[in-house]
Amino acid sequence: MNRIKILPETIVGKISAGEVVERPASVVKELIENSIDAGANSISVYIKEFGIAEIKVIDDGEGIPSDDVILAFQRHATSKIKDEKDLQRISSLGFRGEALYSIANVSKLKIITQYKDEDTGTEVYLTGGNLVSQKPVVTKGTTVEIRDLFFNTPVRRKFLKSSYTEKAHIIETVQNYCLAYPEISFSLFIDREEVLNIPQVKTLYDRISQVFGLEFTEKLKFKTISKDNYKIELFLGGEELLRKSKGRQLIFVNRRPVKDFSIVNTIYKAFHINENHPQFFIFINLPPEDVDFNVHPAKKEVRFREPQIIHQLIFRMSEYQVKSSMIAEETNQWKVNADLSSISQISAFYTESIFNKEEIFHFFSIGDAIVVIQRVDGIVFLDFHAAHERVNFEKILNKMSEQIVKLTFPHVINLNPQDYVLIKENLHILNELGIEAEDFGENSIVIRALPEIIKYIDIAGMIENIALTLKEGTSTPDFIEIKRKIAATIACHSSLRANEKINHFEIKALLQELERTSDPEHCPHGRPVRKFISLDEIKKWFLR
């Protein structure tokens, strides 16, 4: 049996870094938070080779006193906490004294800083957490340069995603702090190209407009509510902004971007939706003692002292917005449609494969997406959206580019900076799938031609979802796999939606086309398309 040993400080440092520094975007996050805590009015971020080669953050904050610079790179060295009581009323973004220590342990780090009340500043250079040099300088604010990230932890590098995925995470990180701090100007440069240039503004509405565009922001409905020491500001998209993917769902607690699934679920309950996803921005402000950020190593999750108050307020706000837009939907998913003139009309016809050519069957719908088909030997439950997805997916992959329609008026799509970078670097894949797209500059692309099969769908929504697919990415970009994922996203957008009316002839054609696909049992995302229950099994339910 191996004996228990105390780990060396070098190993402890790398383990700690693994908890705080997951990817280049984690470094950007920690450095931006330090700049904000230093009272910066302007923050500039420079990236080379998606952050592996270099990350540089420059701010005009108050700087670090000369005597504290070396101490800042020691574990649990912080200016934010003096005793246990301070832990209960934290108002700064950083407080544990782990960020600089963790970053320095897995990189080659240089910091140049001068405290506002001192005549000279300090330049310090460290490699793998070890001090290499220190000298006096004259400067303003603070500049932190991170080079060769993960140079001494090669396994960590192997787990990074593709270059454009890592870039997207960096852009998302900077965007989040842009939204939370409209009074600070932000700029972001990736490989010398300006990606973001966001000047100071006075309101959250103006900042959302800067980041996501005025056209999108004008579609958001705003509501604010205060109770005791709680204040919640909600920007909620209506029905026209519902998306097939969870795009812009951002939550800020005391100006810190966080993940909170209970809050997200509260908004979904107000919408009464199962398939599409609302877009929203929530800004929650409450006393520091009523929220605990010390739950997650990267402070991504929070714990509220009185979560029920938060949820009640958000539900009331969301429900009011939804009702005022008159987009509340029917919630009973299992009510049989009384209108039998369309898909739910009892019909009879011939098809093939799982239905013998001589076999006559009947069908009707239950809920808004399931068709029940009667066979001699049992019944089949068919998700017609999933079935249509499978059919369209294979058309898109195999025949899409054969029927291209030139648009009379080219369609210009304005994207947020994160989506723009993702799409721009993968335009060649879109073109191979028959979507004739070009970079249009100013965070925009232009669509000049589309495959016949998708010419009537929401192109902007589809492009946003393709960007989300690309952001998920893989560690080793596989062209074929990326192409399949994009085709699956397009198929989802071009397929029949739940609640759409289709007649029995269309059902028949859909079943026949489904049988000709390579995998009629699953949609492109792997979900089941149909479920067969034999008559013998049904009889067993009744002990027959």
UniProtKB/Swiss-Prot annotation:
Annotated GO MF terms: ATP binding; ATP hydrolysis activity; ATP-dependent DNA damage sensor activity; mismatched DNA binding
Pfam families in the cross-refs: DNA_mis_repair (PF01119), HATPase_c_3 (PF13589), MutL_C (PF08676)
Any GO BP: mismatch repair
Gene Ontology CC terms: mismatch repair complex
The entry's keywords: DNA damage, DNA repair
PANTHER family: DNA MISMATCH REPAIR PROTEIN MLH, PMS, MUTL, DNA MISMATCH REPAIR PROTEIN MLH1
HAMAP family registered for this protein in UniProt: DNA_mis_repair
UniProt protein name: DNA mismatch repair protein MutL
Species annotation: Thermodesulfovibrio yellowstonii (strain ATCC 51303 / DSM 11347 / YP87)
